[in-house]
């Protein structure tokens, strides 16, 4: 079994350099990412590289299964551009199925509302309302229950169509308290929400949830920490035999 990863395929685009930033730009991801129209922005990590690697892994596992059944090997090809187009899910399918070319919406969602970032009295919070029931609970906790029954906001399509007016009402209420207050209140009410954490806060959250996001490897008397494998197995737990080398070690 042989697997190759390229930037733009092994045919016409074989000579094109496959850098994550280039593919984020040329593959359309930056056109839907950023604070406002005219300000395309790259994702904060090399996400296209990661997604493509995962697609390659899926392909390899499928090929291994085929070989185990038939004894046949095969060649697998994955490219950054195709992986990105596949990973843009609803944005890509909107274009392919309906001819809609999506644009930048900042932190908003193109087809769900309210599903974005809201400023509170101290720091921003994310609210991800996925259905009408959650929206009614949100309005109840924000002490504006009449908004949930307003015909302009009664259903998700209504809320998307009247997004600007709705957000003005929500922001006014959110500014009345801090992010932690709203997080606790809304979460207890069943409204999906959460603060925008730093990397250190994100690791602390995972630790508090007993997800064990960091592992320590003792190598030659030295303890080295690294990010844990996110997959858990009931029969074959992940083993960490060797830590990554130190700078200039190899």
Residue ranges and their predicted role:
Residues 84, 162, 201-205:
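Beta-rich nucleic-acid/ligand-interaction surfaces
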Residues 1-130:
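Active-site-adjacent "lid/gating" segments in soluble enzymes
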Residues 218-250:
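Flexible, small-/acidic-enriched active-site or ligand-binding loops
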Residues 95-102, 205-218:
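Short, surface-exposed loop/helix-turn segments at secondary-structure junctions
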Residues 113-189, 193:
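Aromatic-enriched alpha-helical interface/lid elements that frame and gate functional surfaces
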Residues 60-64, 143, 250:
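Non-catalytic, well-ordered alpha-helical segments in soluble enzyme domains
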Residues 187-209:
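Conserved PLP cofactor-binding pocket of PLP-dependent enzymes
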Residues 116-120, 214-220:
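Short acidic-hydrophobic surface loop/beta-edge motif
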